[in-house]
Amino acid sequence: VLFRKVGAELKVVGVIDGVERYTESSVVRVNVKVKDRWAGHQAGQFAFVNFDDKEAAHPFTISSGWKGDGHMFFLIKELGDYTSTLASRLKTGQAVTLEGPYGQFTFKSDKPRQIWVAGGIGITPFIARMHALAAEPSKQTVDLFFCVPHVDGPGFAKARADAQA
């Protein structure tokens, strides 16, 4: 009875409007434009993403802040059989179903400084928060410590540009 019913009211349809693979970090960036009633999300939340109705949805952190324009993106680490094939299977214009947002990763604090520590793909909630701060700046100072095996290539350059925005 509960199969495919829980969360049904949180499902929206979107379209992939870009796919980019960052070879040096084995990460795929998937840009999505939602078509209808996405209520928005907070930095650090995730959604169940279904790129193909023949497959089960997978949970991925929403890597972008919400601007209210329907655009968002996911940074997905190529870790297993499913995620390692996404870059070759996903196409611009392809339909996608999102369910969410879920989770709570809070950045709320009355302290003047925050220290963020992330490793690898764990950077995604912090990237989303950087996007949110670019839209609505805060007086808090943020120190970000990002641990990765490679600090070169376009993926890292994009993360650095996001941090400096």
Descriptions of predicted regions:
Residues 123-137:
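Histidine-anchored nucleotide/phosphate-binding helix
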